[in-house]
């Protein structure tokens, strides 16, 4: 790293990717910082930079001691051990050591006392909530939010008529001809365990999944202007039901609250929506299928006079970036739900949804909000000609 680049980073102050320390003598404290970065997407620790942005003036002797301290902290104080990279940077006011901590592949990482640390903006904190710890296991592929049991939803909650149609259409067999009891059959389909629906099974086939999963719904609101208003809205709906119903109702809500344009059609034609339906289908399907089901929050669809926002709980998983998804890369967060969604929704499961949405309607922005733990899609509406 060049000194000019280091100065630019220092000028931006610490954040969730950069930490500054004048000097370090405590292995335990350094290990906690490493754990937090390993659990939170990686980052860099700069030793030799004071809180006010000035250089602390480290010497060659300091470099030897600090490199040994980094090695000891990473191998003996972090569980499982990690392998950070170090770089010594020369400045006119002394040396700086940069410690690069990659995002971990064996989350959750802990300190030697079993404490899980994560980054929170420019600081670190202990991860204590069950949901947060579950998300760390999820990011390592050890558990998935869609396979968690839903106590209180059992075989009596199955929408049997809907399931029969699905089963016969996709397996070319009559459900009535199956020798297995329904709980066993649903268990074999990874939708139920010990007679209890998991999240996937409930969202796909329960009559009223929101009975036990009240936050896994879609909240849709249309506002009259460009900002959220506390009391004034044009339309508002809490959309509940099976995921297929939520999908269709969500599409209907957006289409019912945006303009329809005549274009080249005759005067009696219904007009085409200003945002193509195909683009909306891809974006809303992605929101429902790929949201983080360890986050107790609904999908939100917010309509404004100039845009439509689709906000999904959970930022992009692991190392996935906005640039990646625009190129068709994917990381399936909810594999059971995604496998059945290909049979129920206009969803292919091959990472092409964002590409198709952009092809149909390029005026779409994406924000991967790690601090807010959400993914925001903004579809800009066409300005009407006056």
Say what each PLM segment does.
Residues 81-154, 294-298, 344, 348-351, ...:
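Intrinsically disordered, low-complexity regulatory tails
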Residues 100-103, 207, 222, 303, ...:
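Flexible glycine-/small-residue-rich
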Residues 49, 90-92, 213, 303, ...:
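Generic beta-strand structural signal
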Residues 120-284, 288-295, 303-305, 317-331, ...:
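Active-site helix-to-loop segments that bind/position phosphate- or nucleotide-bearing substrates
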Residues 356-360:
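A short beta-strand->alpha-helix segment at the C-terminal rim
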Residues 44, 54, 307-309, 365, ...:
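Structural motif
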Residues 308-344, 383-386:
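Glycine-rich/acidic phosphate-handling loop/turn and adjacent ATP-lid/helix
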Residues 1-45, 49-98, 104-107, 274:
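Polybasic/polar functional segments that serve as interface/processing modules
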């Amino acid at each position: 790293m060049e000194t000019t680049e280091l100065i630019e980073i220092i000028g931006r102050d610490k954040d969730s990717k950069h930490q500054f320390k004048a000097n370090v003598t405590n292995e335990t404290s350094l290990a906690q910082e490493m754990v937090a970065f390993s659990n939170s997407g990686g980052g860099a620790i700069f030793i030799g930079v004071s809180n006010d942005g000035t250089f602390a003036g480290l010497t060659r002797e300091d470099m030897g001691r600090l490199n040994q301290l980094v090695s000891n902290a990473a191998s003996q104080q972090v569980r499982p051990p990690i392998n950070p990279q170090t770089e010594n940077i020369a400045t006119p006011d002394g040396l700086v050591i940069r410690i690069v901590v990659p995002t971990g592949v064996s989350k959750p990482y802990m300190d030697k006392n079993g404490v899980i640390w994560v980054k929170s903006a420019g600081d670190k904190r202990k991860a204590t909530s069950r949901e947060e710890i579950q998300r760390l296991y999820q990011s390592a592929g050890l558990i998935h939010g869609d396979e968690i049991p839903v106590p209180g939803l059992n075989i009596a909650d199955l929408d049997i008529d809907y399931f029969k149609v699905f089963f016969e259409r996709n397996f070319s067999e009559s459900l009535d001809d199956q020798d297995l009891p329904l709980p066993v059959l649903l268990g074999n389909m990874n939708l139920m365990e010990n007679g209890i629906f998991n999240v996937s099974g409930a969202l796909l086939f329960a009559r009223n999944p929101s009975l036990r999963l009240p936050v896994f719904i879609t909240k849709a609101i249309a506002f009259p202007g460009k900002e959220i208003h506390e009391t004034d809205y044009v339309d508002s709906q809490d959309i509940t039901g099976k995921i297929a119903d939520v999908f269709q109702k969500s599409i209907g809500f957006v289409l019912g609250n945006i303009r329809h344009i005549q274009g080249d059609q005759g005067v009696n034609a219904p007009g085409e929506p200003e945002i193509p339906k195909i683009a909306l289908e891809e974006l809303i399907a992605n929101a429902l299928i790929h949201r983080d089901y360890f986050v107790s929050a609904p999908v939100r669809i917010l309509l404004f006079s100039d845009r439509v926002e689709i906000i999904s709980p959970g930022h992009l998983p692991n190392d996935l970036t906005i640039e990646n998804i625009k190129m068709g890369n994917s990381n399936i967060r909810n594999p059971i739900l995604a496998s059945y969604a290909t049979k129920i929704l206009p969803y292919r499961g091959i990472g092409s949804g964002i590409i198709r949405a952009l092809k149909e309607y390029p005026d779409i922005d994406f924000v991967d909000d790690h601090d807010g733990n959400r993914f925001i899609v903004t579809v800009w509406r066409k300005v009407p000609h006056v």
